[in-house]
Amino acid sequence: MESLVLVREEHPEIHHNLTELRRLSFEKMLDKFGYDTNLSHRLIEKFLHFRHEVTLYPDVEGCLRFLQGKYKIASLTNGNANVMRLEIGKYFDVHLSSEEVGVKKPDRMMFHQVSRSLEIPHQRILHVGDNPVDDVQGAVDAGLQAIWINRSQNPWPLDSTDPHEIRDLSELIEFLS
């Protein structure tokens, strides 16, 4: 983790590309311990393979089934997991990562790219996310509607008005019904 922080500081121009930041972090660690730095490419391949072995919350697939056909669904991430590589990828119309867009949430450009990709005005998009700054405030600042999914029941940490909050995705279904 420490090397990832150092790489971010050394390469601010790729702050949005978590995969390359992580690869460079692996490279830095390999070099530090006297290993061939070219191994960083194989390490990132392995990392990304295991990155996509996820366990979903029990409410995820049921919610996606409910939404499918009623709404266009997009995945928007600052990370390097691609929802289209998962079994639930079939429910999504669009997947966008900060690596593809060139900026990361909370930058408005991320949210506006979703609007363009879905061909829906950004004012008509509801963004559901778990990060108060990157997801909720970022979406609101970009002109989208936002819901905070707060599974841990934390207090709202920002000075801005509390957003609509849900504890799990069954509450999203209730909200939309």
Q: Predicted segments — roles?
A:
Residues 35-37, 61, 65, 71-177:
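Asp-based, Mg2+/Mn2+-dependent phosphohydrolase catalytic module
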Residues 1-58:
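N-terminal helical cap/lid subdomain that shapes the substrate entry/recognition surface
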